[in-house]
């Protein structure tokens, strides 16, 4: 994601990123620093597994902390519950669909840091979300897939809390 692209995120997604950052900064990193300091005092570092693993884990944690910090700084929190009622699909919508194969599906359009296919949370920049954005309840949209074109009917559009 380029720096010009907004990082839209729901309040629940924002909180999840903040919670992960807090956990890394205040719990995991201090524990690893303690292990590395202890292991460093045990002599030869070149064959010291605790030291080598600890340093590697600390780099991973630091990398994740930098990533989360940047994502939170670029975040634009959008609360779907505060959106005026509309039958048009935008970020934060919970959308009922009738897929081309006759299956009904409900998807929630969320930020890229919140994707969870097990809970039908799809990114607002995913191909499915992109073809749904700005469409209205009752509209049919076309999703181009590697297998071909799929016609999808929008059955419902709601703006409710997304956990």
Swiss-Prot record:
Keyword flag Transcription regulation: yes
Keywords: Coiled coil, DNA-binding, Transcription, Transcription regulation
GO molecular function terms listed in the Swiss-Prot or TrEMBL record: DNA binding; RNA polymerase binding
Superkingdom assignment: Bacteria
Keyword set includes Transcription: yes
Record's function text: Necessary for efficient RNA polymerase transcription elongation past template-encoded arresting sites. The arresting sites in DNA have the property of trapping a certain fraction of elongating RNA polymerases that pass through, resulting in locked ternary complexes. Cleavage of the nascent transcript by cleavage factors such as GreA or GreB allows the resumption of elongation from the new 3'terminus. GreB releases sequences of up to 9 nucleotides in length.
Protein name (database record): Transcription elongation factor GreB
Name of the encoding gene: greB
């Amino acid at each position: 994601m380029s720096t010009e692209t907004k990082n839209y995120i729901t309040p629940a997604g924002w909180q999840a990123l903040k919670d992960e950052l807090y956990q890394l900064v205040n719990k995991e990193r201090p524990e690893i620093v303690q292990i590395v300091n202890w292991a460093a005092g045990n002599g030869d570092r070149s064959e010291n597994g605790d030291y080598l693993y600890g340093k590697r884990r600390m780099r991973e944690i630091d990398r994740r902390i930098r990533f989360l910090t940047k994502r939170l700084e670029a975040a634009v929190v959008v609360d779907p519950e505060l959106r005026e009622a509309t039958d048009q699909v935008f970020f934060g919508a919970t959308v009922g669909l009738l897929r081309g194969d006759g299956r009904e599906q409900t998807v929630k359009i969320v930020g890229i840091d919140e994707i969870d296919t097990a809970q039908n949370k799809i990114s607002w920049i995913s191909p499915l979300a992109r073809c749904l954005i700005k469409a209205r309840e009752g509209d049919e949209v076309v999703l181009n897939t590697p297998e071909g074109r799929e016609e999808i009917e929008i059955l419902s559009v709601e703006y409710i809390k997304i956990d």
